[in-house]
Amino acid sequence: MAEETSLVADKVPEPAVIDAVADAMPDSLEDALRIVLMKARETNGLICGLSEVTRALDRRTAHLCVLADDCEDEEYKKLVTALAKQNNIDLVSMDEREKLAQWAGLTRMAADGSVRKTLKCSCLAVRDFGERTKALDYLLSQLQ
């Protein structure tokens, strides 16, 4: 019995490992945006889809909006741009809808872990950034 208590006392909790990728200084604005979207997705802070994004922009609950340049509908782009400008919400343009969807986690995965199908996402908004990282600081400094 005495040996069991000494073994329990000898166990030291291991320090938490910091995610080096998420806390690394990004090389570009695109890398910073990818990391920020990844962290926001972890905390359930992403809003996808026209209806949800326009509602969040109108209610001023979004902190950041990302709009794809290759969006099919010009009226869609005008609406999101106008709402973001009207409510003083930062708007970031992205080249491809598929890349934006992949960063937002809108992918179908195969059993082996590879990406089977990537959906398309024309617009998303960030309601909660999650934890504060160097990428978030870099992104916010570039937007001002």
From Swiss-Prot:
The keyword Hydrolase appears for this protein: no
Keywords recorded for this protein, A-Z: Ribonucleoprotein, Ribosomal protein
Keyword Cytoplasm: no
GO annotation (BP), single: translation
Entry GO MF terms: structural constituent of ribosome
GO cellular component, one term: ribosome
Domain of life: Eukaryota
PANTHER family given in the database record: 40S RIBOSOMAL PROTEIN S12
Protein family (similarity comment): Belongs to the eukaryotic ribosomal protein eS12 family.
Designated name of the protein: Small ribosomal subunit protein eS12
